[in-house]
């Protein structure tokens, strides 16, 4: 992501879109990159039309999202202070996995966000990840455990 911060002005939108999506998906903690601020990340994502960030399947999901969108985020002690991050998921089970990885007893949060503030949808790692402008997250709260027998979709 640091590379893109400096090269974005000379890249075509197509190249920037492909490289940004690839770098975002491959970086372990893109929300906590010390070299690229949230403001800079948001500017990078906003500088590229969404269809250039996603493959056709991802863009189809992106276009079909409800408005507003319910999103989830799993946090551990490592990132507990970074709830209002760019990276959320559409899938509560994925958020649950992130909240409990590394043997942690983390927390799953849920929020609502107007669709226009979702900058991309990525499913390259089967995480149903949405990149959001976090200042537009609404009704952030701890997500209640699903009742037994309920199936999360």
Residue map of PLM features:
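Conserved NAD+-utilizing ADP-ribose enzyme module
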Residues: 1-71, 76-86, 90-153
């Amino acid at each position: 992501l640091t590379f893109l911060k400096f090269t974005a002005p000379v890249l075509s939108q197509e190249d920037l879109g492909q490289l940004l999506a690839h770098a975002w998906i491959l970086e372990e903690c893109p929300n906590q990159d010390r070299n690229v601020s949230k403001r800079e990340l948001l500017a990078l994502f906003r500088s590229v039309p969404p269809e250039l960030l996603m493959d056709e399947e991802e863009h189809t999901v992106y276009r079909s999202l409800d408005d507003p969108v319910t999103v989830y985020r799993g946090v551990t002690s490592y990132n507990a202070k970074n709830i209002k991050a760019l990276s959320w998921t559409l899938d509560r089970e994925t958020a649950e996995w992130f909240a409990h990885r590394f043997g942690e007893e983390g927390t799953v949060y849920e929020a609502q966000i107007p669709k226009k503030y979702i900058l991309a949808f990525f499913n390259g790692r089967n995480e149903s990840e949405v990149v959001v402008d976090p200042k537009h997250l609404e009704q952030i709260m701890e997500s209640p455990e699903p009742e037994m027998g309920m199936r999360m979709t």
